């Protein structure tokens, strides 16, 4: 290749000589100048076109292999981060909602069981308060009942109650004696029948059931009288009215009926106060005529029914709604006659 490059140079020199032969005659010689056409041989230098082998560098275009960097586009694998959305698993935090288990704290509510123990003791003084209210009401009732009641029957000796060897001659502490505040109390009873030797030898002071009528002396007993008094029957707590009648009249032992032999008097009356006073009047009158023979049972209506019914051993003997009206002297005699018949049957 270098040799060929050198050959054209002399030819060009020669051409220059021909140019110097500027004589017009020799000008046809320039026709030989086509020899320079041979200089086209350098066209062979087109072989350098092979130099586009640098174009072979176009394989370097493969260098866009860096364009393969978009292969990093798979980095949208970060788009998988939405899979991290499962972190809402912290939504399990509501599971601590069962922490309301502290609501079991109400279990201490059974502690009111301690409050149940005081009520058990409270009912003990309740009867004393109730009896105190009855005692306060008795003077008014006695003043109201005194004009309408007949004279008290003469007092009779108290019954003789033999005491068993196992019994305690002293009254039970749970039984309370209710004093009588009525101004109608009769004179002190006469001598009572003697008791059995065991009861006669029992030490201790005797109790008197008679009390003064002075309201200021309510709850205070008179000085004891040295006379034997029968002990109360255990298991029975009579009402205030019945105890008052017992203090006023002492029935004989023959009239002391057992509870199963007593005549049941059931009175159903209206809830008004006037009806309850009429019931007390009737009860006191019958107890004075039949001491220790009657067992009273009252049924007071909660409303004002205007009813006043008297049953003797389940038999209706008086009814206000049926036209009998209130119990007057004639109606009272009818009830007394029915009770006499029942006592004779027993």
Curated annotation (Swiss-Prot):
It comes from the Eukaryota. Residues 151-162 have a biased composition (Pro residues). Testis specific. The keyword Membrane does not apply. One of its GO terms (cellular component) is cytosol. Keywords: Redox-active center, Selenocysteine, Ubl conjugation. The keyword tRNA-binding does not apply. It holds the Pfam family Rdx. There is a cross-link at residues 270-273 (Cysteinyl-selenocysteine (Cys-Sec)). Truncated SELENOV proteins produced by failed UGA/Sec decoding are ubiquitinated by the CRL2(APPBP2) complex, which recognizes the glycine (Gly) at the C-terminus of truncated SELENOV proteins. Residues 1-40, 151-206 are annotated as: Disordered. GO terms for biological process: response to selenium ion. NCBIfam families: CXXU_selWTH. May be involved in a redox-related process. PANTHER family: SELENOPROTEIN W. Belongs to the SelWTH family. This is Selenoprotein V. It comes from Homo sapiens. The gene is SELENOV.
